[in-house]
Amino acid sequence: MIKLIATDVDGTLVKDGTMQIDPEYMTVIKELVQKGIIFAVCSGRQFISERKLFAPIKDQLLYITDGGTVVRTPQEILMVHTMPRDVWSGMCRMVQEQMPHCDCFVATPDYCLAEDAGSRMFHWLRDSYGYDIREAERLADIPEQDIIKFTVYHKSACEEMCAPLFTPAWKDKTQLAAAGKEWMDCNPLGANKGTAIEFVQKHFGISPEETCTFGDNLNDIEMLQNAGRSYAVANAREEV
């Protein structure tokens, strides 16, 4: 019997970077929750964006946000991974100094920070994803201690842009995962959607065999592997 369903969002339930979801999904999810099934939104998005997207049923869901670095109910954070300052600030400086065609931002459990409020990335996150994103004068020097994720952005080929320099430099210090064509998510080591699902399973006493997951991209692979039933959508990357 399935007790936990977890799904990715962008590329799985909605078109990347949009806030339009089929109303029928809301009806189905509500029916599943009424049957006692835990429904988890498992996305690279931040909490506020997930809440806006699922507004009609926002208080009935479990939230796995920022690529698996945070697990929370509507009321409280159950689990959070943070990243060492030297790691995220070092990645930030590399992007800003050596990758001129890319942009970047950092995430806390509740909001994001980026340098240029007029940039394409900033506007897309704020206006299309519904993010709470704030401008920082010098991103690498912000005082925030609870950084949970660093993300590189390129308008069409982020994975390829990161391959020559960024990925080799940081692949052993962070958990890297491409998220669509535009993003490279960098999580604390050991933090991904799969470890978040494992936490949820242990927290609620649910086995992998009682878990069903849906995804489409490389950052969904660990989540799909930790479920007795896992499904890649038709448009998923071949590796998935």
Residue ranges and their predicted role:
Residues 3-18, 224:
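Asp-based phosphoryl-transfer active-site loop
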Residues 20-122:
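Active-site phosphate-binding/coordination module
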Residues 94, 101-214, 218-223, 235:
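Conserved acidic, metal-coordinating active-site core of Asp-based
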Residues 36-40, 59-61, 149, 209-211, ...:
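Short active-site oxyanion
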Residues 5, 63, 230-232:
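Short, well-ordered beta-strand core segments
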Residues 1-7, 30, 34:
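Non-catalytic pre-domain segments flanking phosphatase-related domains
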Residues 226, 230-240:
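Asp-based, Mg2+/Mn2+-dependent phosphohydrolase catalytic module
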Residues 9, 45, 215-217:
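Active-site metal-binding loops of divalent metal-dependent hydrolases
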